[in-house]
Amino acid sequence: MRRPFRATPVQKDGPRSNRDIRVPRVQLIDAEGQNHGDVSIQEAIAMAEEAGLDLVEIVPNAEPPVCKIVDLGKLKYQNQKKAAEARKKQKTVEIKEIKMRPNIDTHDYEVKMKAALRFFEEGDKVKVTLRFRGREMAHQELGMKLLQRVKEDTVEIAKVESEPKLEGRQMMMVLAPR
């Protein structure tokens, strides 16, 4: 015989309110912020309905739980705005890549380093990639010297996150801002 379908109960997001609060007594704060002390839950709900607002559990872990008389819709809206603002302020760290060759000219090197400094100021990580072509693979020490030079030039503003390593025909190093 088949078992009957039993869906998981819907979890409400946000604080408990009105009849969802299942404790005998609460500490009540009214809409003006005045503390009414320890009150029975029925009395608190009656006061909230009288004011045309909702009874919302603010601190559920307290003994007794702290409840406030507020407009639940307005409270949820304010919480959504706060969360959106926090998300907007978060910055995702990107990895910017700077590609070079082992026999790079001095001016080209300076231009690449200026770009790397700009990336560090923006808070991004920088991946320095050296590509070896043809017979350059025989002179990997030149690539290692160049990456050491990059490391020395950025020592005040960046730290090495991954040391230089060779992968195929490319040598890579990742730097992160301090």
Swiss-Prot record:
Disordered: annotated span: 1-20
Gene Ontology biological process terms in this record: ribosome disassembly
Keywords noted in UniProt: Cytoplasm, Initiation factor, Protein biosynthesis
Pfam families: IF3_C (PF00707), IF3_N (PF05198)
Record carries keyword Zinc: no
Superkingdom of the organism of origin: Bacteria
A GO-annotated cellular component: cytosol
Function: IF-3 binds to the 30S ribosomal subunit and shifts the equilibrium between 70S ribosomes and their 50S and 30S subunits in favor of the free subunits, thus enhancing the availability of 30S subunits on which protein synthesis initiation begins.
Complexes and interactors: Monomer.
Similarity annotation: Belongs to the IF-3 family.
Protein name from the UniProt record: Translation initiation factor IF-3
Organism: Brucella anthropi (strain ATCC 49188 / DSM 6882 / CCUG 24695 / JCM 21032 / LMG 3331 / NBRC 15819 / NCTC 12168 / Alc 37) (Ochrobactrum anthropi)
Lineage: Bacteria, Pseudomonadati, Pseudomonadota, Alphaproteobacteria, Hyphomicrobiales
